[in-house]
Amino acid sequence: MKKINIFCCTIENFDLLNKLPKNIIPLGLGKKDFPSNWLNDKNGKNISNLNKYFGEATGMYWIWKNKLNDYSSDDWIGFCQYRRLWLNDLLDSKQKYSSSNLFSKLLKNDNKNFDTNDSVILQPTFFETDSLRGQFVKNYGSKVLDDCLNLLDANDKNDFKDYLEGNSLSICNMFIAKPLIFDK
């Protein structure tokens, strides 16, 4: 039977995370202390001290360096956030929020996406009136983006420039992948 573990990244200790199904594993990030039954990015090989700069990526790094070998090629590794969980079905916006409503909709191992894919990402978010580059420049200016582009080799730079001219992206550092894909 394939194993599907979703690591739920958080910088806070929320009681709700202790009530999640066993395959959704709380992963505490950053400086704070977390319950002993949680994983945290301060043990083993880690870059926890960089969490204030890289957010969930410190947890992803920790899983990559410390847990990846615990998985077989048929297993799945995923990430979500304490405010954004993977669901099988959409919550009806008129539905009253309760943990039982939420828990009944959480992603299940028998979801058909796991039968036909090696990775799953969020449905993209689309910008209606601007490109990704335009949106970034409006918020942060062009210097940072241009400096980053100049760090890339020619092929990657051109590919990334093309991507930035598009208007869609998958947000939130949420994905689920087979270990081989995650390792890349």
Model regions: which residues?
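ER/Golgi luminal nucleotide-sugar-dependent glycosyltransferases, focusing on the catalytic module
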Residues: M1-K184
